Amino acid sequence: MSSYLFTSESVSEGHPDKVADQISDAVLDAILTQDQRARVACETMVKTGVAIVAGEITTSAWIDLEALTRKVIVDIGYDSSDVGFDGATCGVLNLIGKQSPHIAQGVDRKKPEEMGAGDQGLMFGYATNETDSYMPAAIHLSHRLVEQQAKIRKKKNSPLSWLRPDAKSQVTLRYENGVVSAIDAVVLSTQHAPGIKQKDLIEAVREEIIKPVLPAKWLHKGTKFHINPTGKFEIGGPVGDCGLTGRKIIVDTYGGWARHGGGAFSGKDPSKVDRSAAYAARYVAKNVVAAGLADRCEVQVSYAIGVAEPTSISVTTFGTGKISDDKIEKLIRKHFDLRPYGIIKMLDLVHPMYQQTAAYGHFGRKPKEFSYLNGEGETVNATAFSWEKTDRAAALRADAKLK
């Protein structure tokens, strides 16, 4: 019998790196609301008393970057010097420039379907049937823990009013013969107000944050709980650590279970294949698994800057495929257009839906329909997390001739 442990972690929306991610994606959303053809590469750094927003942006839109940055910080919960960071009074430094015209000449085409990739690179997508979200269980549970922390913290008349925005989670699972059998260890560290006793904090976190999230069937007498194991966690957020866009790429994806091409997501418009192709690869892998072609599937795509067609598409199902990996790859090429324009059209990506992806994972979330007013004052309907749909599973299964 095969037995092993696997661990994944997540961080809350108040973690400094995630504050930076959310600011970068808020800038992207504000621009896409007015200009769907914009080119955006926005990076943010947050540290004590200041947010620095930099990058390369080419757009016809105008946004109030300072007000936008402050709103994101305050909405997260950094709204007072008592918390250590105040979005209303912190400095905001704008260091945004224009994108190189040499990149534009390689990406833009007269025919939109011939649009070239915004950069070279390799991207991975992954899916597994071990959870309803088609995500690895450890990262799924880690996300839900810090999501619950924020939910309780922001709740009106919260029973845990002393919670602060910064938090981290970690879940270690035991696998028996490739299937989750138990939770071996849980780590939950949360920033808190001064004066809370460690004993009270541990009890409250277990009851209000951990218990509602973790499946009882996987808990046992030997499960280890590490709640604020260092003791006090009063200094957090951008005061405790410098935050940067793009530093939580494993949290953003599959918690270390699948491979990663190295490119971050936040602050990048859909012409950047670092983001859009990673979303497309997840969409492909999820539909392959949802179709029953495999229990696990990892898809890799790669691109050359200025070139529309992917330089490679490869698939592995780790021995779980119901048909060969070669046949699955042929089906992928037939059913999915993985050129940059094809991805943007397939997933309808040129809409302001990215700030909500910047915390609690870009994958494993439910597709969410929404509407917004564009720059012309017209109402536009769109779907966030469109890459989580399984709308091509039936066609894949039929074409694979599986009963």
Curated annotation (Swiss-Prot):
Entry binding sites for K(+): E43
Residues of the signal peptide: none
Organism field: Stenotrophomonas maltophilia (strain R551-3)
Gene: metK
UniProt xrefs under InterPro entries: ADOMET_SYNTHASE_CS (IPR022631), S-AdoMet_synt_C (IPR022630), S-AdoMet_synt_central (IPR022629), S-AdoMet_synt_N (IPR022628), S-AdoMet_synthetase (IPR002133), S-AdoMet_synthetase_sfam (IPR022636)
Record: residues binding ATP: H15, D166, A167, K168, K232, F233, D241, R247, K248, A264, K268
Enzyme class, UniProt record, top EC level: transferase
Biological process according to GO: one-carbon metabolic process; S-adenosylmethionine biosynthetic process
Keyword Metal-binding applies: yes
Subcellular location: Cytoplasm
Residues that coordinate or bind L-methionine: E56, Q99, D241, K272
Full protein name: S-adenosylmethionine synthase
Entry binding sites for Mg(2+): D17
Family: Belongs to the AdoMet synthase family.
